[in-house]
Protein backbone atom coordinates (compact mmCIF):
# COMPACT_ATOMS: atom_id res chain seq x y z
CA UNK A 1 0.00 0.00 0.00
CA UNK A 2 1.46 3.37 -1.05
CA UNK A 3 1.97 6.27 1.33
CA UNK A 4 -0.93 8.26 -0.15
CA UNK A 5 -3.28 5.27 0.11
CA UNK A 6 -2.27 4.78 3.73
CA UNK A 7 -2.94 8.47 4.36
CA UNK A 8 -6.43 8.10 2.90
CA UNK A 9 -7.08 5.00 5.00
CA UNK A 10 -5.93 6.76 8.17
CA UNK A 11 -8.00 9.86 7.36
CA UNK A 12 -11.15 7.75 7.05
CA UNK A 13 -10.33 6.00 10.32
CA UNK A 14 -9.99 9.31 12.19
CA UNK A 15 -13.24 10.61 10.67
CA UNK A 16 -15.08 7.44 11.73
CA UNK A 17 -13.68 7.69 15.27
CA UNK A 18 -14.61 11.39 15.47
CA UNK A 19 -18.19 10.66 14.40
CA UNK A 20 -18.59 8.02 17.11
CA UNK A 21 -16.95 10.18 19.77
CA UNK A 22 -19.10 13.22 18.91
CA UNK A 23 -22.26 11.13 19.26
CA UNK A 24 -21.01 9.82 22.60
CA UNK A 25 -20.14 13.36 23.75
CA UNK A 26 -23.60 14.69 22.92
CA UNK A 27 -25.26 11.73 24.63
CA UNK A 28 -23.19 12.24 27.79
CA UNK A 29 -23.98 15.96 27.72
CA UNK A 30 -27.73 15.28 27.56
CA UNK A 31 -27.48 12.82 30.46
CA UNK A 32 -25.59 15.45 32.47
CA UNK A 33 -28.31 18.02 31.86
CA UNK A 34 -31.10 15.62 32.74
CA UNK A 35 -29.43 14.49 35.94
CA UNK A 36 -28.33 17.93 37.17
CA UNK A 37 -31.19 20.15 36.03
CA UNK A 38 -34.16 17.76 36.10
CA UNK A 39 -33.07 15.55 38.99
CA UNK A 40 -33.64 12.44 36.91
CA UNK A 41 -31.89 10.57 34.15
CA UNK A 42 -34.77 10.14 31.72
CA UNK A 43 -38.06 11.96 31.42
CA UNK A 44 -40.74 11.90 28.75
CA UNK A 45 -40.85 15.69 28.73
CA UNK A 46 -37.11 16.25 28.59
CA UNK A 47 -36.49 13.56 25.98
CA UNK A 48 -39.22 14.42 23.51
CA UNK A 49 -39.88 18.12 24.21
CA UNK A 50 -38.54 20.08 22.47
CA UNK A 51 -37.82 17.53 19.72
CA UNK A 52 -35.54 19.95 17.85
CA UNK A 53 -33.07 20.12 20.72
CA UNK A 54 -32.89 16.34 21.00
CA UNK A 55 -33.07 14.84 17.52
CA UNK A 56 -31.46 17.52 15.35
CA UNK A 57 -28.08 17.48 17.17
CA UNK A 58 -27.81 13.72 16.67
CA UNK A 59 -27.19 14.52 13.00
CA UNK A 60 -26.01 18.13 13.06
CA UNK A 61 -23.50 17.82 15.91
CA UNK A 62 -21.30 15.08 14.35
CA UNK A 63 -21.42 16.82 10.96
CA UNK A 64 -20.44 20.13 12.55
CA UNK A 65 -17.56 18.46 14.41
CA UNK A 66 -16.19 16.87 11.24
CA UNK A 67 -16.40 20.19 9.36
CA UNK A 68 -14.56 22.07 12.13
CA UNK A 69 -11.88 19.37 12.40
CA UNK A 70 -11.45 19.31 8.62
CA UNK A 71 -11.06 23.09 8.40
CA UNK A 72 -8.53 22.97 11.24
CA UNK A 73 -6.32 20.78 9.04
CA UNK A 74 -6.43 17.86 11.45
CA UNK A 75 -7.07 15.22 8.78
CA UNK A 76 -4.45 16.54 6.35
CA UNK A 77 -1.42 14.65 7.69
CA UNK A 78 -2.82 11.76 9.73
CA UNK A 79 0.44 9.80 9.72
CA UNK A 80 2.64 12.65 10.89
CA UNK A 81 1.07 14.76 13.64
CA UNK A 82 3.26 16.20 16.42
CA UNK A 83 1.49 15.61 19.73
CA UNK A 84 1.62 19.24 20.92
CA UNK A 85 0.20 20.54 17.64
CA UNK A 86 -2.51 17.88 17.74
CA UNK A 87 -3.36 18.84 21.33
CA UNK A 88 -3.61 22.55 20.46
CA UNK A 89 -5.77 21.94 17.39
CA UNK A 90 -8.10 19.68 19.34
CA UNK A 91 -8.38 22.27 22.13
CA UNK A 92 -9.21 25.15 19.76
CA UNK A 93 -11.65 23.00 17.77
CA UNK A 94 -13.39 21.92 20.99
CA UNK A 95 -13.83 25.58 22.00
CA UNK A 96 -15.37 26.45 18.61
CA UNK A 97 -17.64 23.38 18.64
CA UNK A 98 -18.83 24.02 22.21
CA UNK A 99 -19.60 27.69 21.47
CA UNK A 100 -21.38 26.80 18.24
CA UNK A 101 -23.53 24.11 19.87
CA UNK A 102 -24.27 26.43 22.79
CA UNK A 103 -25.62 29.25 20.62
CA UNK A 104 -27.53 26.93 18.28
CA UNK A 105 -29.02 24.30 20.59
CA UNK A 106 -28.73 25.45 24.21
CA UNK A 107 -29.13 29.21 24.60
CA UNK A 108 -32.88 29.21 23.85
CA UNK A 109 -33.66 26.65 26.59
CA UNK A 110 -35.88 27.90 29.45
CA UNK A 111 -33.43 28.31 32.37
CA UNK A 112 -34.18 30.24 35.55
CA UNK A 113 -30.60 30.31 36.84
CA UNK A 114 -28.22 31.76 34.26
CA UNK A 115 -25.12 30.23 35.82
CA UNK A 116 -26.44 26.96 34.41
CA UNK A 117 -25.76 28.31 30.92
CA UNK A 118 -22.11 28.79 31.83
CA UNK A 119 -21.95 25.38 33.49
CA UNK A 120 -23.45 23.73 30.39
CA UNK A 121 -20.88 25.42 28.16
CA UNK A 122 -17.94 24.35 30.34
CA UNK A 123 -19.16 20.75 30.62
CA UNK A 124 -19.78 20.50 26.87
CA UNK A 125 -16.29 21.84 26.12
CA UNK A 126 -14.67 19.41 28.58
CA UNK A 127 -16.59 16.45 27.15
CA UNK A 128 -15.78 17.44 23.58
CA UNK A 129 -12.08 18.00 24.23
CA UNK A 130 -11.52 14.80 26.21
CA UNK A 131 -13.98 12.78 24.14
CA UNK A 132 -12.13 13.58 20.93
CA UNK A 133 -8.51 13.80 22.06
CA UNK A 134 -8.37 10.53 24.01
CA UNK A 135 -9.81 8.31 21.21
CA UNK A 136 -7.54 10.04 18.67
CA UNK A 137 -4.51 9.51 20.86
CA UNK A 138 -5.38 5.83 21.19
CA UNK A 139 -5.80 5.45 17.42
CA UNK A 140 -2.49 7.22 16.78
CA UNK A 141 -0.69 5.19 19.44
CA UNK A 142 -2.02 1.86 18.14
CA UNK A 143 -1.27 2.82 14.52
CA UNK A 144 2.32 3.66 15.36
CA UNK A 145 2.73 0.38 17.22
CA UNK A 146 1.52 -1.70 14.30
CA UNK A 147 4.25 -2.55 11.82
CA UNK A 148 1.86 -2.10 8.90
CA UNK A 149 1.26 1.52 9.88
CA UNK A 150 4.84 2.51 10.69
CA UNK A 151 6.11 5.03 8.10
CA UNK A 152 8.97 3.52 6.09
CA UNK A 153 11.85 5.87 5.22
CA UNK A 154 14.67 5.43 2.72
CA UNK A 155 17.78 7.64 2.56
CA UNK A 156 19.51 8.36 -0.75
CA UNK A 157 23.05 9.78 -0.84
CA UNK A 158 23.74 9.86 -4.59
CA UNK A 159 22.23 9.14 -8.01
CA UNK A 160 23.52 5.56 -8.01
CA UNK A 161 21.28 4.70 -5.06
CA UNK A 162 18.11 5.76 -6.90
CA UNK A 163 17.91 2.48 -8.82
CA UNK A 164 18.37 0.52 -5.60
CA UNK A 165 15.51 2.46 -4.06
CA UNK A 166 13.26 1.90 -7.08
CA UNK A 167 13.85 -1.84 -6.84
CA UNK A 168 13.18 -1.90 -3.09
CA UNK A 169 10.13 0.34 -3.49
CA UNK A 170 8.62 -1.95 -6.15
CA UNK A 171 8.83 -4.90 -3.73
CA UNK A 172 7.53 -3.12 -0.62
CA UNK A 173 6.49 0.56 -0.97
CA UNK A 174 8.21 3.20 1.15
CA UNK A 175 6.52 6.29 2.58
CA UNK A 176 9.30 8.86 2.50
CA UNK A 177 12.62 9.43 0.77
CA UNK A 178 15.26 11.63 2.40
CA UNK A 179 17.92 13.04 0.09
CA UNK A 180 21.14 13.37 2.07
CA UNK A 181 23.32 14.61 -0.77
CA UNK A 182 26.83 15.95 -0.95
CA UNK A 183 26.97 19.75 -0.62
CA UNK A 184 28.72 19.90 -4.01
CA UNK A 185 25.83 18.19 -5.82
CA UNK A 186 24.64 20.35 -8.74
CA UNK A 187 21.11 21.76 -8.75
CA UNK A 188 20.29 20.12 -12.09
CA UNK A 189 21.20 16.74 -10.59
CA UNK A 190 18.94 17.36 -7.59
CA UNK A 191 15.99 18.34 -9.80
CA UNK A 192 16.56 15.33 -12.05
CA UNK A 193 16.50 13.11 -8.99
CA UNK A 194 13.30 14.73 -7.68
CA UNK A 195 11.62 14.37 -11.09
CA UNK A 196 12.45 10.69 -11.01
CA UNK A 197 11.05 10.21 -7.51
CA UNK A 198 7.79 12.17 -7.81
CA UNK A 199 5.81 9.52 -9.77
CA UNK A 200 6.65 6.90 -7.10
CA UNK A 201 4.05 8.26 -4.62
CA UNK A 202 6.44 9.04 -1.78
CA UNK A 203 7.10 12.10 0.33
CA UNK A 204 10.42 13.70 -0.61
CA UNK A 205 12.64 15.62 1.81
CA UNK A 206 16.17 17.00 1.60
CA UNK A 207 18.73 17.39 4.37
CA UNK A 208 19.36 21.16 4.32
CA UNK A 209 22.64 22.94 3.86
CA UNK A 210 23.88 25.55 6.33
CA UNK A 211 22.49 28.29 4.05
CA UNK A 212 19.05 26.65 4.03
CA UNK A 213 19.03 26.47 7.82
CA UNK A 214 20.10 30.11 8.21
CA UNK A 215 17.42 31.35 5.78
CA UNK A 216 14.65 29.36 7.45
CA UNK A 217 13.99 26.91 4.62
CA UNK A 218 14.50 23.90 6.89
CA UNK A 219 11.62 22.79 9.09
CA UNK A 220 11.05 20.35 11.96
CA UNK A 221 7.76 18.73 12.98
CA UNK A 222 8.90 17.75 16.47
CA UNK A 223 11.79 18.56 18.80
CA UNK A 224 13.26 15.10 18.20
CA UNK A 225 13.12 15.41 14.40
CA UNK A 226 15.98 16.11 12.03
CA UNK A 227 15.68 19.48 10.23
CA UNK A 228 14.46 18.82 6.68
CA UNK A 229 13.22 20.66 3.61
CA UNK A 230 9.94 19.00 2.64
CA UNK A 231 9.84 19.08 -1.16
CA UNK A 232 6.35 17.61 -1.53
CA UNK A 233 4.77 20.00 0.97
CA UNK A 234 3.48 23.51 0.31
CA UNK A 235 3.67 26.92 1.95
CA UNK A 236 0.01 27.12 2.96
CA UNK A 237 -0.95 26.21 6.51
CA UNK A 238 -3.03 23.07 6.97
CA UNK A 239 -6.09 25.20 7.80
CA UNK A 240 -5.67 27.38 4.70
CA UNK A 241 -5.23 24.35 2.47
CA UNK A 242 -8.42 22.74 3.81
CA UNK A 243 -10.33 26.01 3.37
CA UNK A 244 -9.00 26.20 -0.19
CA UNK A 245 -10.22 22.67 -0.95
CA UNK A 246 -13.60 23.31 0.71
CA UNK A 247 -13.95 26.47 -1.39
CA UNK A 248 -13.09 24.49 -4.55
CA UNK A 249 -15.76 21.90 -3.79
CA UNK A 250 -18.44 24.48 -2.98
CA UNK A 251 -17.77 26.75 -5.98
CA UNK A 252 -17.42 23.92 -8.51
CA UNK A 253 -20.65 22.27 -7.31
CA UNK A 254 -22.53 25.58 -7.50
CA UNK A 255 -21.14 26.41 -10.95
CA UNK A 256 -22.02 22.97 -12.34
CA UNK A 257 -25.63 23.49 -11.24
CA UNK A 258 -26.12 27.19 -12.01
CA UNK A 259 -24.42 27.04 -15.41
CA UNK A 260 -26.24 23.90 -16.55
CA UNK A 261 -28.27 25.82 -19.21
CA UNK A 262 -25.04 27.33 -20.57
CA UNK A 263 -23.39 23.89 -20.58
CA UNK A 264 -26.26 22.55 -22.69
CA UNK A 265 -26.12 25.49 -25.12
CA UNK A 266 -22.36 25.14 -25.58
CA UNK A 267 -22.69 21.39 -26.05
CA UNK A 268 -25.27 21.98 -28.79
CA UNK A 269 -23.03 24.55 -30.51
CA UNK A 270 -20.08 22.15 -30.50
CA UNK A 271 -22.24 19.34 -31.85
CA UNK A 272 -23.63 21.31 -34.82
CA UNK A 273 -20.36 23.15 -35.62
CA UNK A 274 -18.32 20.10 -36.65
CA UNK A 275 -18.22 16.33 -36.58
CA UNK A 276 -16.88 14.66 -33.47
CA UNK A 277 -17.55 14.36 -29.74
CA UNK A 278 -18.72 17.29 -27.61
CA UNK A 279 -16.02 16.91 -24.99
CA UNK A 280 -12.29 16.60 -25.47
CA UNK A 281 -10.41 14.45 -22.97
CA UNK A 282 -6.66 14.56 -22.67
CA UNK A 283 -4.08 13.18 -20.25
CA UNK A 284 -2.32 15.82 -18.17
CA UNK A 285 0.16 15.57 -15.29
CA UNK A 286 -1.12 16.79 -11.93
CA UNK A 287 -0.62 16.48 -8.18
CA UNK A 288 2.42 14.37 -7.16
CA UNK A 289 3.33 14.02 -10.83
CA UNK A 290 0.45 11.62 -11.47
CA UNK A 291 -1.59 11.63 -14.70
CA UNK A 292 -5.28 12.51 -14.85
CA UNK A 293 -7.79 13.13 -17.62
CA UNK A 294 -8.71 16.77 -18.19
CA UNK A 295 -12.11 17.60 -19.71
CA UNK A 296 -12.76 20.48 -22.11
CA UNK A 297 -15.26 21.37 -24.81
CA UNK A 298 -13.83 20.32 -28.16
CA UNK A 299 -12.70 23.43 -30.04
CA UNK A 300 -10.70 21.78 -32.84
CA UNK A 301 -11.57 19.62 -35.79
CA UNK A 302 -11.63 15.89 -35.26
CA UNK A 303 -8.15 14.24 -35.35
CA UNK A 304 -6.44 17.65 -35.06
CA UNK A 305 -3.56 16.02 -33.18
CA UNK A 306 -3.33 12.63 -34.82
CA UNK A 307 0.48 12.84 -34.92
CA UNK A 308 2.90 14.82 -32.72
CA UNK A 309 1.28 17.08 -30.07
CA UNK A 310 1.23 20.73 -31.13
CA UNK A 311 0.61 24.03 -29.36
CA UNK A 312 -2.22 26.18 -30.70
CA UNK A 313 -1.27 29.44 -32.43
CA UNK A 314 -2.94 32.55 -33.86
CA UNK A 315 -5.20 31.71 -36.81
CA UNK A 316 -4.72 28.00 -36.16
CA UNK A 317 -6.66 26.25 -38.97
CA UNK A 318 -7.48 23.32 -36.68
CA UNK A 319 -9.75 25.50 -34.50
CA UNK A 320 -13.42 25.67 -35.49
CA UNK A 321 -15.35 28.96 -35.66
CA UNK A 322 -17.35 28.09 -32.55
CA UNK A 323 -14.17 26.87 -30.88
CA UNK A 324 -12.40 30.17 -31.57
CA UNK A 325 -15.26 32.11 -29.96
CA UNK A 326 -15.31 29.76 -26.96
CA UNK A 327 -11.55 30.08 -26.48
CA UNK A 328 -11.77 33.87 -26.61
CA UNK A 329 -13.92 33.87 -23.47
CA UNK A 330 -12.40 30.70 -21.96
CA UNK A 331 -15.77 28.92 -22.21
CA UNK A 332 -14.09 25.72 -23.38
CA UNK A 333 -12.60 25.39 -19.87
CA UNK A 334 -15.97 25.23 -18.07
CA UNK A 335 -16.15 21.39 -17.93
CA UNK A 336 -13.03 21.47 -15.76
CA UNK A 337 -15.24 22.35 -12.80
CA UNK A 338 -15.93 18.61 -12.83
CA UNK A 339 -12.17 17.99 -12.55
CA UNK A 340 -12.11 20.41 -9.61
CA UNK A 341 -15.05 18.74 -7.87
CA UNK A 342 -13.45 15.34 -8.40
CA UNK A 343 -10.18 16.48 -6.82
CA UNK A 344 -7.96 16.39 -9.91
CA UNK A 345 -7.64 20.18 -9.98
CA UNK A 346 -8.16 23.35 -7.98
CA UNK A 347 -9.67 26.68 -9.05
CA UNK A 348 -6.27 28.38 -8.61
CA UNK A 349 -3.08 26.49 -9.37
CA UNK A 350 -0.50 25.97 -12.15
CA UNK A 351 -2.02 24.90 -15.45
CA UNK A 352 -1.41 21.17 -16.05
CA UNK A 353 0.63 20.16 -19.07
CA UNK A 354 1.07 17.09 -21.22
CA UNK A 355 4.04 14.81 -20.60
CA UNK A 356 5.35 15.51 -24.11
CA UNK A 357 5.78 19.23 -23.37
CA UNK A 358 6.88 18.69 -19.78
CA UNK A 359 9.88 16.72 -21.04
CA UNK A 360 10.85 19.68 -23.24
CA UNK A 361 10.29 22.24 -20.47
CA UNK A 362 12.48 20.25 -18.06
CA UNK A 363 15.41 20.57 -20.47
CA UNK A 364 15.29 24.35 -19.98
CA UNK A 365 13.82 24.42 -16.48
CA UNK A 366 14.62 21.23 -14.53
CA UNK A 367 12.75 22.63 -11.51
CA UNK A 368 9.39 21.99 -13.22
CA UNK A 369 8.80 19.21 -10.69
CA UNK A 370 8.24 21.84 -7.97
CA UNK A 371 4.69 22.48 -9.22
CA UNK A 372 3.76 18.85 -8.49
CA UNK A 373 3.35 19.68 -4.80
CA UNK A 374 -0.09 21.29 -5.35
CA UNK A 375 -3.12 20.54 -7.49
CA UNK A 376 -3.08 22.08 -10.97
CA UNK A 377 -5.63 24.82 -11.48
CA UNK A 378 -8.18 26.38 -13.77
CA UNK A 379 -6.26 29.64 -13.50
CA UNK A 380 -3.10 30.94 -11.86
CA UNK A 381 -0.68 33.83 -11.83
CA UNK A 382 1.27 32.34 -14.74
CA UNK A 383 -1.62 32.29 -17.25
CA UNK A 384 -2.65 35.82 -16.17
CA UNK A 385 0.83 37.27 -16.73
CA UNK A 386 1.81 35.28 -19.83
CA UNK A 387 -1.55 34.34 -21.38
CA UNK A 388 -1.86 31.40 -23.76
CA UNK A 389 1.49 29.72 -24.31
CA UNK A 390 2.20 28.97 -27.97
CA UNK A 391 5.98 28.59 -27.60
CA UNK A 392 8.28 26.71 -25.27
CA UNK A 393 9.83 29.95 -23.99
CA UNK A 394 6.39 31.22 -22.94
CA UNK A 395 5.76 27.94 -21.14
CA UNK A 396 8.98 28.43 -19.16
CA UNK A 397 7.99 32.03 -18.34
CA UNK A 398 4.60 30.83 -17.14
CA UNK A 399 6.31 28.17 -15.03
CA UNK A 400 8.46 30.82 -13.33
CA UNK A 401 5.38 32.82 -12.35
CA UNK A 402 3.73 29.64 -11.07
CA UNK A 403 6.77 28.84 -8.92
CA UNK A 404 6.53 32.31 -7.37
CA UNK A 405 2.81 31.69 -6.73
CA UNK A 406 3.55 28.38 -5.01
CA UNK A 407 6.14 30.02 -2.75
CA UNK A 408 3.66 32.76 -1.77
CA UNK A 409 0.30 30.98 -2.05
CA UNK A 410 -2.47 32.08 0.29
CA UNK A 411 -6.24 32.46 0.31
CA UNK A 412 -5.82 36.21 -0.20
CA UNK A 413 -3.63 35.69 -3.27
CA UNK A 414 -6.08 33.13 -4.69
CA UNK A 415 -8.91 35.67 -4.43
CA UNK A 416 -6.84 38.31 -6.25
CA UNK A 417 -6.02 35.85 -9.03
CA UNK A 418 -9.68 34.89 -9.43
CA UNK A 419 -10.73 38.55 -9.80
CA UNK A 420 -7.97 39.13 -12.38
CA UNK A 421 -9.15 36.04 -14.26
CA UNK A 422 -12.73 37.34 -14.37
CA UNK A 423 -11.38 40.52 -15.98
CA UNK A 424 -9.46 38.50 -18.57
CA UNK A 425 -12.60 36.50 -19.41
CA UNK A 426 -14.87 39.53 -19.89
CA UNK A 427 -12.22 41.31 -21.96
CA UNK A 428 -12.08 38.32 -24.29
CA UNK A 429 -8.29 37.97 -24.12
CA UNK A 430 -8.24 34.23 -24.72
CA UNK A 431 -7.32 32.64 -28.02
Whereabouts are the PLM-identified features?
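A short, structured surface patch at a secondary-structure boundary
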Residues: 314-375, 417-421, 425
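C-terminal terminal-structure detector
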Residues: 365-431
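Signature of alpha-helical transmembrane segments in polytopic membrane proteins
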Residues: 1-146, 431
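Short, glycine-rich, amphipathic interfacial segments at transmembrane boundaries or analogous
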Residues: 211-212, 218-220, 279-320, 379-398
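Membrane-cytosol interface motif
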Residues: 90, 94, 148-164, 277-300
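A hydrophobic, helix-centered structural microdomain
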Residues: 240-304, 339, 411, 416-431
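N-terminal hydrophobic signal-anchor/signal peptide
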Residues: 1-21, 25, 80-82, 135-260
Amino acid sequence: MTYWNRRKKQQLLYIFVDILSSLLVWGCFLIFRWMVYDGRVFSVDTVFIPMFNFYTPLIAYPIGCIIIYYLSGYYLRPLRKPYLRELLRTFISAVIIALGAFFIFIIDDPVTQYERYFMSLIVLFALQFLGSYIPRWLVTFISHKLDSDTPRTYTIHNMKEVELFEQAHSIEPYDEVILDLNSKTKEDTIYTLINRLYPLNVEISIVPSLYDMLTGAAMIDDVSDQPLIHITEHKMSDTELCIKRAFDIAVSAIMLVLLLPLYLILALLVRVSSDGPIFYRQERIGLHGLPFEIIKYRTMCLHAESATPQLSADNDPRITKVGRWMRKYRLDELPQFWNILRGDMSIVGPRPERRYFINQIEEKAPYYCMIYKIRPGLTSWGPIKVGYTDTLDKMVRRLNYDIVYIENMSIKLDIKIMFHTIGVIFNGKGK
